[in-house]
Amino acid sequence: MTLDDLNARYARLAADLGDQGIRVNGISAGPIKTLAASGIGDFRYILRWNQLNAPMRRNVTQEDVGNAAAFLCSDLAMGITGEIVYVDSGYNSVGMTFAGDEE
């Protein structure tokens, strides 16, 4: 399943379940320092890259993602469904660049 497939499923579920008052949203988190992530080779370099290149110049924490999830589950987000919320310090807004890319 591709990321586009997954995003389409959120939208389809939101459309199908909205009339029952069920909201469906997703969270796309940036790299997070976790026990599981420590098993990824050179993960510290991924974190460093993200910190240097994300607009907010910081990495995402587990608390950041939890706060976004709590918001989406709360009454404050009653009008939000079928969305993917990026919790990545803005990295998704600048896109991926590679060494040698010309500006």
Please describe what each predicted stretch is.
Residues 28-39, 87:
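Short, flexible catalytic-loop segment of classical short-chain dehydrogenase/reductase
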Residues 19, 29, 74:
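Short, conserved catalytic or interaction motifs in soluble domains
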Residues 15-19, 78:
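Alpha-helical segment proximal to the catalytic Tyr-Lys
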Residues 7-8, 26, 45-80, 89:
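C-terminal helical subdomain
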Residues 1-16:
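Conserved catalytic helix of short-chain dehydrogenase/reductases
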Residues 20, 25, 83:
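Rossmann-like NAD(H)/NADP(H) cofactor-binding core
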Residues 81-103:
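Short C-terminal tail/terminal secondary-structure segment
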